[in-house]
């Protein structure tokens, strides 16, 4: 059987992009694939505004697949529907030169540093957790003047590494 990786939301009924759906050789690592037929994706770079990553921003979905609104919740609808058929996903992403969509974070999880740069903590936390010495990592700077990183060490791995280095644990 075939298995496809894709991206979509309930509000976009649900497919926006998928890897491999348009035939062999149409999958690309680190992306969720090509945008589906009849759907258009644009990237709102004003939502991110990071000079180091100017091609990233909020993923905006355009198409007949976009919901009309949230049932009995006009306020929430106004926050995400720009105009009929145009939806703010709340996800950060980028399109490469061939039209493959990559998801890079969430708009609401980002925060601004004192130097004006925006940070999406999830990729940094995931990189820290690649170390066998780190059990969990949380990066936060929302509503703060400083950014804080809390690391929960993997004590078993830490003791083994110290022993291998000749340090008495």
What are these regions (language model features)?
Residues 1-27, 40, 47, 135:
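Gly/Ser/Thr-rich phosphate-binding loop
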Residues 49-54, 58-113, 130:
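Conserved ATP-binding/catalytic segment of the ANL
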Residues 28-35, 81-84:
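Short Gly/Pro-enriched turn/cap motifs at secondary-structure boundaries
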Residues 122-128:
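Short amphipathic alpha-helix segments
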Residues 90-92, 131-155:
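C-terminal boundary motif of the adenylate-forming
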């Amino acid at each position: 059987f075939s298995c496809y990786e894709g991206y979509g939301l309930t509000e976009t009924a649900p497919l926006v992009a998928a890897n491999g759906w348009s035939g062999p050789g149409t999958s690309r690592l680190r992306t969720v694939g090509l945008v589906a037929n009849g759907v258009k994706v644009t990237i709102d770079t004003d939502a991110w505004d990071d000079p180091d990553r100017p091609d990233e921003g909020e993923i905006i979905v355009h198409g007949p697949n976009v919901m009309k609104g949230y049932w009995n919740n006009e306020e929430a609808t106004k926050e995400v529907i720009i105009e009929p058929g145009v939806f703010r996903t709340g996800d950060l992403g980028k399109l490469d030169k061939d039209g493959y969509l990559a998801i890079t974070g969430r708009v609401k999880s980002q925060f601004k540093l004192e130097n004006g740069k925006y940070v999406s903590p999830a990729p940094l936390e995931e990189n820290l957790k690649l170390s066998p010495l780190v059990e969990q990592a949380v990066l936060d700077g929302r509503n703060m003047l400083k950014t804080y990183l809390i690391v929960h060490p993997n004590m078993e791995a830490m003791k083994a590494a110290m022993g291998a280095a000749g340090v008495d644990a």
